[in-house]
């Protein structure tokens, strides 16, 4: 039976593929004829935002991407950074937002699967995962179902695959009611001489399909991920892929074994737009053409058309260019792991992307125009408006600061995430030194006595909404600060830029200014961006998400015996605030959660201060002077010391300092840390801080079972712990809504 690959190309069909009339005109001019149905699908997949970055490319080029430790920057499946001794860390963050809203379990699971593949396709064994999740307001009827599905999906895939989840974020805001965010991060370890790239080399060489069979799942997924949602969202369920972590585990082992055999010339995982994107990227990067014969593609469904095979996003698949003499050896490895291995085409020297099905040519397109020379836009953008200054004296005070602290520490955004991370395997592989719940996750580097890596993921979307430039800076600074607070040296970062519709100048303005802020902070902090992902059109019925440029970073600890945790303080220790007192309440959680206001500017990020204070803290930790360390962020000083008290199970008696109590307690000024140390060490730290020009203040002493701050706060650590640990399980059990 012959499967029909033809359909009439109508304006409706073109629009359904997300192609604008001018883009279709460009296709006609490029190929000099009407495209086939398969070709239309290929253009639609390769020219959408998800694959081409057409709206953001111009601005992404401005980011700092190189540094003394950077081995591979953006443009590959993941970034590669040197960690010494011939080892490198390979990492990236990527979104799976749209699929996770439609089908939370599979959407999140395949997001984890996709990012793990990005790491091991480079030749690295995954050693750590994180996920940054944003949901709608807790009261929204869908939120609990989405949280439950996404967390189960992330855990179900990561746990079965066997990678520890070491960190992440979970936040709630009504602006995510119609579009949740699932940003998945993975990191792996490799040797310098064992890094594999996706650039095809050599003509007439076999192109090999590896892994699971191809089905109809996920057809059109990349196109869906580049569109806004509306009322027809339920119809999009078939565009969500289905993942199998056990197949992926076999694929990992088979790929690493194959790489060790010397058979691999180039390798690319099949992610968005499946076979189309992986083949085009490999060919275009190597300035080669690719010919595919679809009759050789392993399929698990009958009568699949060329269009379906080319655009399927079935999971756990790879494409590779192979050394011909190694074919038998390569095939034996994949058969051993129970995976498909099929030669589905060859490299050519004519820069054409040719697809053959049932003996007929169903696509013949210029490969460069699909790949690195795809359309690029310089979209109009508007400078975001600025908030007027908001002095702390203009912000109302609360009558009862103890009650305010209990309310904030037990709020949806600041309470413990234990309910989430207890569903993840945080200890598998046996190298975890710090699990979620602190400033950064830390794992030992296998094969080294003392070396460890620290990981954090951060962004404060409400700051980005108020001021995308400062918000972009702050996301980088907080990630850098969290890594620093363990004693690690931040090495490099990856960005996951989640925004609304870039065709709206105000949204495009948010993206442009956030990238500017990120770039400025990365340059100032020597924290280059080595990989990343952009997710646009996160809007439903015209309502955009908060601008959310998530930054994930990796840091290096030369000796993990000199490492700080947030829960390490001991009775009798002195607590020291480094970096100055709180003054800034604009865009604070104090204003938002106690007064339901989003007023004032985001806090200013002084990058020179950030660097100086951070380097001071890091050296104190590495010199063994510190028993605990925590950076200040949401909720300021009061929340930071409350978390330290909860994690160490100890109280403290502190002096809030001179000034307005709400600003001293809850101000969100940046570049600040609280450390604990023995009284003798605290004196030395104070002396050193004075010499280094780092503002400091002795806060008080650790001890007892209550947290007392001046005359304002007096609350038991038990009550703090109950509020902190209670919100999430109670919410998931249906016992409460938003803010109680």
UniProtKB/Swiss-Prot annotation:
Pfam families in the cross-refs: AIRS, AIRS_C, FGAR-AT_linker
Active-site residues (renumbered): 50, 96 (proton acceptor)
Binding site for Mg(2+) 1: 94, 533
GO terms for biological process, alphabetical: 'de novo' IMP biosynthetic process
ATP-binding in keyword set: yes
Metabolic or biological pathway, per its Swiss-Prot or TrEMBL entry: Purine metabolism; IMP biosynthesis via de novo pathway; 5-amino-1-(5-phospho-D-ribosyl)imidazole from N(2)-formyl-N(1)-(5-phospho-D-ribosyl)glycinamide: step 1/2
Binding-site residues, substrate: 95-98, 117, 241, 313-315, 535
EC number from the UniProt entry: 6.3.5.3
Highest taxon, organism lineage: Bacteria
Binding locations of ATP: 53, 92, 495, 532
Main location: cytoplasm
Family of this protein: Belongs to the FGAMS family.
General function of this protein: Part of the phosphoribosylformylglycinamidine synthase complex involved in the purines biosynthetic pathway. Catalyzes the ATP-dependent conversion of formylglycinamide ribonucleotide (FGAR) and glutamine to yield formylglycinamidine ribonucleotide (FGAM) and glutamate. The FGAM synthase complex is composed of three subunits. PurQ produces an ammonia molecule by converting glutamine to glutamate. PurL transfers the ammonia molecule to FGAR to form FGAM in an ATP-dependent manner.
HAMAP family: PurL_2
Protein name: Phosphoribosylformylglycinamidine synthase subunit PurL
Organism: Brucella canis (strain ATCC 23365 / NCTC 10854 / RM-666)
Gene that produces this protein: purL
């Amino acid at each position: 039976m012959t499967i029909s690959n033809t359909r009439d190309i109508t304006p409706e069909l073109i629009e359904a593929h997300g192609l604008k009339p001018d883009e279709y005109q460009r296709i006609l001019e490029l190929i000099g004829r009407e495209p086939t149905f398969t070709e239309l699908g290929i253009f639609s997949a390769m020219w959408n935002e998800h694959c081409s970055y057409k709206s953001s490319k111009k601005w992404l080029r401005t980011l700092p991407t190189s540094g003394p430790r950077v081995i591979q920057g953006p443009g590959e499946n993941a970034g590669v950074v040197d960690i010494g001794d011939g080892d490198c860390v390979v990492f990236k963050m990527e979104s799976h937002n749209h699929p996770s809203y439609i089908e939370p379990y599979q959407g999140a699971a395949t997001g984890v699967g996709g990012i793990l593949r990005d790491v091991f396709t480079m030749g690295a064994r995954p050693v750590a995962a994180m996920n940054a999740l944003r949901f709608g307001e807790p009261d929204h009827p869908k939120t609990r179902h989405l949280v439950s599905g996404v967390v189960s999906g992330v855990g179900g895939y990561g746990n079965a695959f066997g990678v520890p989840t070491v960190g992440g974020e979970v936040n709630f805001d009504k602006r995510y009611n119609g579009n949740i965010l699932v940003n998945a991060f993975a990191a792996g370890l490799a040797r310098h001489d064992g890094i594999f790239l996706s650039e095809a080399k050599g003509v007439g060489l076999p192109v090999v399909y590896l892994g699971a069979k191809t089905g109809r799942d996920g057809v059109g997924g990349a196109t869906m991920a580049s569109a806004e949602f509306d009322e027809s969202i339920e119809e999009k369920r078939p565009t969500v892929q289905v993942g199998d972590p056990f197949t992926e585990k076999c694929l990992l082992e088979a790929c690493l074994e194959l790489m060790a055999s010397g058979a691999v010339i180039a390798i690319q995982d099949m992610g968005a737009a499946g076979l189309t994107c992986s083949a085009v990227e490999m060919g275009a990067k190597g300035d080669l053409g690719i010919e595919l014969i679809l009759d050789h593609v392993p399929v698990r469904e009958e009568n699949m058309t060329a269009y379906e095979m080319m655009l399927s996003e079935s999971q756990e698949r790879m494409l590779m260019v192979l050394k011909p003499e190694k074919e038998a050896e390569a095939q034996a490895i994949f058969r051993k792991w129970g995976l498909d291995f099929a030669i589905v085409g060859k490299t050519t020297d004519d820069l054409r992307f040719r697809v053959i099905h049932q003996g007929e040519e169903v696509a013949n397109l210029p490969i460069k125009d699909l790949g690195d020379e795809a359309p690029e836009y310089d979209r109009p953008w508007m400078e975001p408006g600025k908030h007027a200054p908001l002095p702390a004296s203009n912000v109302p005070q609360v009558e009862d600061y103890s009650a305010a602290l209990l309310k904030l520490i037990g709020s949806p955004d600041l309470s413990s995430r234990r309910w989430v991370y207890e569903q993840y395997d945080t200890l598998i592989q046996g190298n975890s030194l710090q699990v979620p719940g602190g400033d950064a996750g830390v794992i030992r580097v296998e094969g080294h006595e003392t070396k460890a890596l620290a990981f954090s993921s951060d962004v404060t979307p409400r700051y980005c909404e108020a001021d995308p430039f400062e918000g972009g800076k702050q996301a980088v600074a907080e990630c850098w600060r969290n890594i620093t607070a363990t004693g690690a040296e931040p090495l490099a970062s990856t960005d996951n830029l989640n925004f609304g519709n870039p065709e709206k100048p105000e949204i495009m303005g948010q993206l442009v200014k956030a990238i500017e802020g990120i770039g400025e902070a990365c340059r100032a902090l020597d924290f280059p961006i080595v990989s990343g992902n952009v997710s646009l059109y996160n809007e439903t019925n015209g309502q955009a998400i908060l601008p959310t440029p998530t930054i994930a970073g990796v840091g290096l600890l030369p000796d993990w015996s000199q490492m700080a945790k947030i829960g390490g303080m001991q009775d009798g220790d002195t607590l020291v605030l480094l970096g100055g007192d709180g003054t800034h309440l604009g865009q604070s959680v104090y204003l938002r959660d106690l007064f339901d206001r989003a007023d004032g500017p985001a806090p200013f990020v002084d990058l020179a201060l950030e660097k100086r204070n951070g380097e001071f803290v890091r050296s104190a930790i590495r010199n063994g002077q510190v028993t605990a360390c925590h950076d200040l962020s949401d909720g300021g000083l009061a929340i930071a010391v409350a978390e330290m008290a909860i994690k160490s199970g100890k109280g403290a008696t502190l002096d809030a300092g001179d000034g307005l109590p709400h600003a001293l307690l809850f101000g969100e000024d940046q570049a600040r840390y609280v450390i604990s140390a023995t009284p003798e060490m605290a004196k030395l730290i104070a002396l050193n801080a004075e010499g280094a020009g780092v503002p400091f203040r002795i806060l008080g002493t650790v001890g007892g079972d209550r947290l007392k701050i001046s005359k304002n706060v007096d609350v038991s650590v038990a009550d703090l712990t109950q509020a902190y640990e209670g919100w999430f399980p109670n919410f998931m059990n249906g016992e409460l809504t938003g803010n109680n």
